[in-house]
Amino acid sequence: MAEAEDQQNFVAHNGDQVPDQGSDELHNGLPYQVHDETLVHQPYEVEDPILEPQQYEVPDPTLEPQQYEVPDQTLEPQQYEVDDQLEYHQYQLQDQANEDVQDHSQDDLQYQPQNQEQFQLQDEAHDQAQYQAQGDVQDHNGDEVQDKVEDEEGIPEHLESLQKSEPEEDATVGGEEKRWPGWPGETVFRMLVPAQKVGSIIGRKGDVIKKIVEETRARIKILDGPPGTTERAVMVSGKEEPESSLPPSMDGLLRVHMRIVDGLDGEASQAPPPSKVSTRLLVPASQAGSLIGKQGGTVKAIQEASACIVRVLGSEDLPVFALQDDRVVEVVGEPTSVHRALELIASHLRKFLVDRSIIPFFENQMQKPTRQMDHMPPPHQSWGPPQGHAPSVGGGGYGHNPPPYMQPPPRHDSYYPPPEMRQPPMEKQPHQGISAYGREPPMNVHVSSAPPMVAQQVTQQMQIPLSYADAVIGTSGSNISYTRRLSGATVTIQETRGVPGEMTVEVSGTGSQVQTAVQLIQNFMAEAGAPAPAQPQTVAPEQQGYNPYATHGSVYAAAPTNPPGGYATDYSSGYGY
């Protein structure tokens, strides 16, 4: 039994069939009992302590520490050191550039604390600090660029120096841009308005102008001007509000302009609206230069945006009550386009502020003629013939003598020059007024060194054949009404006593008004007469009569029922001036 059990144990252990032998027999020289002890213990003791520990312990102490510890100790510190050196070099270059640009040493100190703070930041916030430093540099340089732009816009040097010396905390309003020169101050606009349009601004019992003042918070005053003037200056002022796109002064100006264009006076309901209107502003010469801009860039942009013609007229086109350094800004175009151009012009000029204490000075100076009053001619003199010697154009046959009233004696030429000087040939006339819309300014008398016009009342009489009555009066009085509206003069027509076949046309008003009315009457007569001579400005032969003035028909004459813009539009319709 024992032998059988030993044989079964051996077979279970080795998996081999062992011959049935006794326990004292040797198997390969070894007893079965000894062979069993070695074979049973050796396979498990050799494999377990050698193979298994090497399989799990070797990778842990050798490979894994090298894989994670080496990059942390070598690569990452080197990478951040290189970045810090490059950024430090970059800040050094920025500091050097700022030292070259800035005049004050304080600007350099602004960057040193920032650079020191940059290097103290942790690595994870490093990028954010870098962007912040770059933003500071851009803001610093941006202030300098803004100063240069404002200098180019025409800010006077003495105001520019005051502006730079102001503290930074007071330099901005509403977080936008620097305050304008003269701050705090008021914006003042002066618009020239025909006298007959003043009523549409005031309204019945002043209700219209009172409503505009209450709604816009602007101050509106209509200046009377010297006696005899056909225009009035409407001054609109108000406290400037830079944060507002439509400050009180601009709002008031635009509303006054709308009343002039769409006024509800009696004339507006009788005449159709014209296709072209004209608006004129009085501005100081310095503001006019700023409005033109460098190489005309500013005024060109306004013209393109509004589809209007915007021009700055010379000193010869100033009204008698204008200040010496004033200029006239004229806008011509369709009513809506002119309104848009006026808004753009006011937006550009609103930055020129005026102290409120100076506004009464404007009011007082503009209510009296200020332009060379010492050259005013005596009351008994005019550019026409001596009183009591009315010129005779007809008598003895029409055109028998040249019109003597167009060539007064030298002693009567004191202020208004003779027609040869007042009306040069068309090809030699300077480009003034609104020639694109059918007229030149009626006051072309300011030539050479002649003084400007003054509000002196004169009277002119003309003897005209009755055959020209229809041309002068027009259908249903259209021509004579057109002459009165355009010139502003008083024109009366009556038959000449004792001279059959003639009529007397009497024109009264200021020198410019009389000149314009006479010119218009001559143009109507020329259109009904013979062709013009080759030399329009010379004295005509006897057989040509009024023909010397035919060439001026294109300047003043127009269809009275639908005048083509310019002053004709101003005085013949409800659309302003």
Curated annotation (Swiss-Prot):
GO molecular function: RNA binding
InterPro entries tied to this protein: KH_dom (IPR004087), KH_dom_type_1 (IPR004088), KH_dom_type_1_sf (IPR036612)
UniProtKB keywords: Cytoplasm, Nucleus, Repeat, RNA-binding, Transcription, Transcription regulation
GO terms for biological process, alphabetical: positive regulation of flower development
Disruption of the gene: reported phenotype: Delayed flowering without a significant effect on the photoperiodic or vernalization responses. The late-flowering phenotype in flk-2 is rescued by the disruption of PEP (pep-2, pep-4).
Keyword hit for Transcription: yes
Location of the region described as Disordered in the Swiss-Prot/TrEMBL record: 1-107, 158-181, 370-431
Cross-referenced Gene3D superfamilies: 3.30.310.210, K Homology domain, type 1 (3.30.1370.10)
Subunit structure: Interacts with HOS1. Interacts with HUA1 and HEN4.
PANTHER family: KH DOMAIN CONTAINING RNA BINDING PROTEIN (PTHR10288)
Protein name stated in the entry: Flowering locus K homology domain
